[in-house]
């Protein structure tokens, strides 16, 4: 596993949660559909690192980790199955901003996901001589999700 890819959080007020994550935290909205808002930090190249999902309760639902390549998914699937946990395969295109993945549930009820292919949408800075911080962003404006948690 390389790093944290993204997390899914269920919220009861999608507009209020989106305002908090964009205005207070300083994340950038990359996409929205009827029940979800996708957000990322300014120094992240991928489509999103946080997905807010409208639902009847508040909760942390999924944590996704990036693996090197698709072949790794088969190896991790085998390992998870050997520990006795069922694995769900997710097809490319089933989840916004990513390719094929595997999902499994932890004993405490959270869904863990492993994914190899993530959609790249670019950073807010140039890859050549990037500035260390982008001026004028609202809120805290962390560079990456792993600097936010």
What is each model feature region?
Residues 1-15, 45, 60-65, 126-149:
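N-terminal beta-strand motif that seeds the catalytic metal site of vicinal oxygen chelate
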Residues 2, 8-46:
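Core segments of cupin and vicinal oxygen chelate
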Residues 14, 70-73:
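Residues at or immediately preceding the N-termini of alpha-helices
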Residues 18, 74, 112:
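Alpha-helical elements of the RecA-like P-loop NTPase motor core of helicases
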Residues 28-61, 111-118:
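Conserved short beta-strand elements that form part of the metal-binding/catalytic scaffold
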Residues 49-59, 63-68, 75-81, 88-91:
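DNA polymerase sliding clamps and clamp-related checkpoint/processivity subunits
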Residues 77, 81-144:
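Vicinal oxygen chelate
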């Amino acid at each position: 596993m390389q790093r944290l890819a993204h997390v899914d959080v269920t919220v009861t007020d999608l507009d209020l949660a989106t305002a908090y994550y964009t205005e207070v935290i300083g994340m950038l909205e990359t996409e929205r559909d009827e029940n979800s808002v996708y957000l990322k930090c300014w120094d992240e190249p991928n489509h999103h690192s946080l997905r807010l999902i409208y639902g009847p309760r508040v909760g942390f639902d999924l944590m996704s980790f990036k693996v090197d390549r698709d072949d790794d998914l088969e190896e991790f699937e085998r390992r998870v199955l050997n520990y006795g946990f069922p694995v769900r395969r997710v097809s490319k295109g089933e989840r916004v901003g990513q390719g094929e993945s595997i999902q499994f549930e932890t004993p405490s009820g959270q869904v863990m996901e492993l994914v190899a292919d993530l959609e790249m949408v670019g950073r807010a800075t140039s890859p050549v001589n990037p500035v260390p911080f982008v001026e004028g962003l609202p809120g805290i404006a962390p560079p990456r999700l792993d600097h936010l948690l």
